[in-house]
């Protein structure tokens, strides 16, 4: 059964092309123990030269994932029925300092661990 506080936005209520994009149209939540799986952006690309752009990954994935369905068409798995999935926003970064950014990103993910949230992250240098 879907927890109504974590239910993805219904496209019959708000079309997929409308409103602010979130990962897979999940609801935006703050870090809390209620969240089982946290979808997180890491808009960071200070570690590369001449190949910037990974910082735009999270917003691109959020926008592109508007069309993802609630049930996987092949496996039949409905993740929103078995756990609380939420968009937790982006890890904080400092666009002028790689070292400060890495420390901020690490602290953000430590908060996820403290709250027993399984992170799924996109964007950033790999």
What are the roles of these predicted feature ranges?
Residues 1-126:
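Metal-dependent C-N hydrolase catalytic cores
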């Amino acid at each position: 059964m879907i927890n109504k506080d974590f239910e993805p936005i219904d496209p019959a209520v708000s079309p997929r092309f409308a409103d602010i994009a979130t990962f897979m149209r999940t609801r935006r939540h703050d870090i809390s123990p209620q969240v089982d799986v946290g979808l997180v952006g890491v808009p960071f690309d200070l570690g590369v030269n001449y190949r910037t752009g990974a910082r735009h990954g999270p917003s691109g994935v959020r926008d592109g994932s508007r069309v993802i369905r609630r049930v996987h068409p092949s496996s039949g798995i409905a993740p929103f029925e078995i756990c609380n999935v939420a968009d937790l926003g982006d890890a904080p970064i400092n666009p002028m300092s790689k070292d400060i950014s890495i420390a901020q990103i690490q602290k953000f993910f430590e908060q996820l661990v403290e709250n027993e949230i399984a992170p799924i992250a996109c964007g950033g240098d790999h």
